[in-house]
């Protein structure tokens, strides 16, 4: 007889209602009980992604949830990943591998095929794990997206899994959100909803009780719990760029990051944003790159378009002024490509074939290729006469010819990155390398000679995940969910 697998799907009334965080917390609750648990998200739309053990690509939220489960991330935890590369189009990634580019209408028609991929991955996880915590996408009540849905109730019905609906009370309108979402579901979908969770509550719970009673009476569904607002949680954001936390003590380093239209993997900067002595500022449309010690050009899903956008904002001139005054510039992935002499796209990987003139700050030339590099990397960074171990991951199309000193030596002996002869400009394909304490300390020393004590980024994430799990165990009636 096939062993029963515990499943639960968390759907939300809106985007950013708390689905990712709730699933991560539930995963940690089960992992702490010794349950072999895995996360699953049928379809994700995000520009922040992670590399898996198979050398595939999934949303970063599922990688964090895998960490909460204390397991390695797998492509089957997020079988359909959509990475927007224009206002109407996106790259479609199935089970970790890029398939093609599609517009929204094309993907809508492709969903029936994508569902087969989703169910295949779900079956694989069921064969391997005792429990699967599932995350929906956006809201299940988007009327225009319900046909052939694979992200929310369409999957829940196909896989026959129970559902809870979470809403963010901090935004206001929580009762309308929950009542309205349930009302817009079909009778069979309503039947599989086991209850509601209210997220990010602050205040006296007694003032909420009359509303909870009304909701339960009107819907016939229980409120399984009310989660408090967890200040300073500092988990990686999947989409929205998180603002700078409050600084404490003396600011030793000022960093600015221009927000490109297709910025990707901005989680690279979380370690800077969370440090109490580093002032990290994101600069948006119409703003100038203000005085700083370091300008970082981030990754991009559409490098040539974002290079054009950078120039339209006048940021290229700001960068040159910054360098004249002795500042440092760091480019990561797409930002690294922009720093070179040229970026060519002969195959039309990002749109119309052609070539763009780079910023010319590094002696590199990049050609975008049809194959994507997906790899977790270990090596050594040599900078300022010092050598430290470095870890990170690469997610990019394109190969760069480098005629500069290459400061990173991977464990396989391959050289990576580039450092200008003047020593002010550096680039690398490695995402996540700043998370290493030794690397961050060395980079800060390179920038302006400052010595800071880096925080243990992995430990901070572990503490955040445990805080979520603690709150869930305290405030949710898990017996109603069979957990």
From Swiss-Prot:
Q: Which residues form the active site?
A: 333 (nucleophile), 431
Please provide, alphabetically and separated by semicolons, the GO molecular function terms listed in this UniProt record.
ABC-type vitamin B12 transporter activity; catalytic activity
Question: Has UniProt tagged this entry with the keyword Repeat?
Answer: no
> Can you list the disulfide-bonded cysteine pairs?
none
Xref: SUPFAM superfamilies: Class I glutamine amidotransferase-like, P-loop containing nucleoside triphosphate hydrolases
Return the PROSITE patterns for the record.
GATASE_COBBQ
Report domain GATase cobBQ-type positions: 252-439
Q: Which family does it belong to?
A: Belongs to the CobB/CobQ family. CobQ subfamily.
UniProt protein name: Cobyric acid synthase
Q: Which organism is it from?
A: Vibrio vulnificus (strain CMCP6)
Query: Which gene is annotated as encoding this protein in its UniProt record?
Result: cobQ
